[in-house]
């Protein structure tokens, strides 16, 4: 009888340990995905050039200007993916899908229908769908619908106590 109870106890402990391991693996994978999306946003796709490091539309002074403030956006994941893949016609927002507008995958329109309004393809920066998904997930986790930039967010990027971050308010 005691053996059965001990075995039952081990099973419960084993199940708890297995759940803990799964949670740890999931948390590590989420952190890796977040870092991957961030690298793509900042470096490969260079979204920050126009949208800014904090996705607030305050990009580099040399950019075309007028980039969307993604912090005020309420686009869902699918909408973000479409905008990144397809760009925004008649705006400086480029498309990152090499085959965009060759068929109706982008907003149900083709290049023939758009004429000169087809968004530009950024030189050397086409993205795979999984890369676009990683950027969308990063934006949703960090910026979409978040309101004003905070000092804490700035310090995550530029380090604690930096002069550049003093212009932002602390989190309430």
Predicted regions and their residues:
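Low-complexity, intrinsically disordered segments with a bias for serine/threonine
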Residues: 10-15, 121
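Mature N-terminal segment immediately following signal peptide/propeptide cleavage
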Residues: 39
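Short, cysteine/histidine-rich loop/knuckle motifs that typically chelate Zn2+
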Residues: 49
